[in-house]
Amino acid sequence: VNRLSEGSQADINDLEIPASVSRQEAADIVVGILEHMARRADAQAARGALLFELRDDVQLRELLTAEAPVRQPLTHLAERILLAAGIDQASAHAPDLVGLVDALLMYQAAKAAPVNARKVLRAYLEGLD
């Protein structure tokens, strides 16, 4: 679990977020993060497999999701991106953005079907008040 989080943490270390971006630019930033994280396809697939394997073990499952060591830094990064895009209640929306990115990442890791992450993220960000 820690090794998976360490890899994700390395993906976001030293990431610079401009002070102000459009919602489309924010989506592009998030897509860049998603694409960078997706390069570790084996780690993402292993995490997905563990999630299914541990679905009945709340404590261990949470270490891969809500309580993962990287979750707080990812949520903080999402909040910074949302703030830069001028989105109200950024801190309230940040966990949802992290969840959406995680879902897109898992979908890609599973090779479920083609999905246009940029379109999905732009639509999500445009829909926020």
Predicted regions and their residues:
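An amphipathic alpha-helix signature
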Residues: 27, 31, 71-79, 118-125
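Hydrophobic alpha-helical segments that form the core
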Residues: 45, 52-53, 76, 88-110, ...
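Helix-loop "lid/cap" segments that line or gate small-molecule binding pockets
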Residues: 31-38, 46-57, 81, 123-127
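Amphipathic alpha-helical packing segments from all-alpha helical-bundle domains
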Residues: 39-48, 58-85, 95
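Hydrophobic alpha-helical connector segments
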Residues: 2-44, 94-97
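Short amphipathic alpha-helical interaction patches enriched in hydrophobic/aromatic residues
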Residues: 12, 16, 58, 82, ...
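Short terminal or interdomain "cap/linker" segment that borders an active site or interface and mediates
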Residues: 115
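Phosphate/oxyanion-binding loops and surfaces in catalytic or ligand/nucleic-acid-binding neighborhoods
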Residues: 7, 36, 40, 57, ...
